[in-house]
Each structure stands twice: as structure tokens, then as C-alpha cells.
């Protein structure tokens, strides 16, 4: 049966904002061809997600920082921050590593395409000391409401995965006061 019931976002948030929980703080409103998510802040994650399809961001309340890795550059210059302010939309191209940083009392909407067969997502962690790749998990994304969280929990549970092979720095699944 065709769903013809609109969702009032403000009313939904007033009743359900408690569902936006760390580390990802997302709730999937719609699925089927695309997934439409509400995402609140603050979130608690240090991973960079690599999506084989584009992602559309709309910042409803407050501002967020989208940390990206421009793989056409080298060294520290490849790490860039994109500020998405209240009312802004931003289309992130496919295959760009990104870490959404959401602050307290902020809400955004993110739209992602369903993944084509044979296309895989990645969660990556870069060393907070030397910025080299520390760990990478690759998987077929079938459930945005759980798989990113599960990857973060897997990284948190493995001290071996969190130690940089280049400089020996221990990395964390959540932001630390001393993290760069």
C-alpha cells in the first residue's frame, strides 16, 4: 500500500528526539530507494564514512561541521572542514570520506541512496597523531539505522585496530579533549 501520510518534522522531534542517541544520533524516517534520516547532536564518533553514492545534507537547526578527506591532495592538506549552517544544504559526492560533527541542540536531515549491488561502504579511522589510515571496515550497507553504530562499537572493542601502525598512537572511537 502506498504511504500517503506526511510527517511533520517539528512534531516528530517534539515527541521523539530521545531516539536520536549516540554515537550516530540518527533515526530513519523513510526507506525505499532512498533513506531519509533525522540526525541530532551532539554525536560521538571519530570515523570517516565512505559512501559509494552521494549524500544530501540539510541543516534544519544550528550548524554542523562535515570533516572530509580530499584524496586528490596529500598530507594534512587533504583534511578539510565544511561548515553547514542552519538552512544550508550540501551535496557530498560519492566516495568522499567524511566525519559529520554535530553539536548540542542541532538537527539535520540526511538523504542517502540505497546501495547498488556490489557497491560497499567503508568506515575509516585516521590517526589523530600522524593522520595516516589506522583502520578500515568494508561492508554492504543494508541498514543505516544500525550498521554504522555496529562498526563504531567494533572499533571501540579492538585496541589492536585502534593503534596506528605508523606512529603507535592509540586512537579512540569517540572524540577526546586532546584529539586534533
From Swiss-Prot:
A divalent metal cation binds at residues 127, 130, 164, 167. O2 binds at residue 45. It comes from the Eukaryota. Substrate binds at residues 55, 102, 112. Its main location: cytoplasm. GO terms for biological process: 'de novo' NAD biosynthetic process from L-tryptophan; anthranilate metabolic process; L-tryptophan catabolic process; quinolinate biosynthetic process; quinolinate metabolic process. It is found in: Cytoplasm. It catalyses: 3-hydroxyanthranilate + O2 = (2Z,4Z)-2-amino-3-carboxymuconate 6-semialdehyde. InterPro entries: 3hydroanth_dOase (IPR010329), RmlC-like_jellyroll (IPR014710), RmlC_Cupin_sf (IPR011051). Pathway: Cofactor biosynthesis; NAD(+) biosynthesis; quinolinate from L-kynurenine: step 3/3. Keywords: Cytoplasm, Dioxygenase, Iron, Metal-binding, Oxidoreductase, Pyridine nucleotide biosynthesis. Fe cation binds at residues 49, 55, 98. GO terms for cellular component: cytoplasm. SUPFAM superfamilies: RmlC-like cupins. Its EC number is 1.13.11.6. Its cofactor is Fe(2+). It is an enzyme of class 1 (oxidoreductase). The keyword Ribosomal protein does not apply. Belongs to the 3-HAO family. Catalyzes the oxidative ring opening of 3-hydroxyanthranilate to 2-amino-3-carboxymuconate semialdehyde, which spontaneously cyclizes to quinolinate. This is 3-hydroxyanthranilate 3,4-dioxygenase.
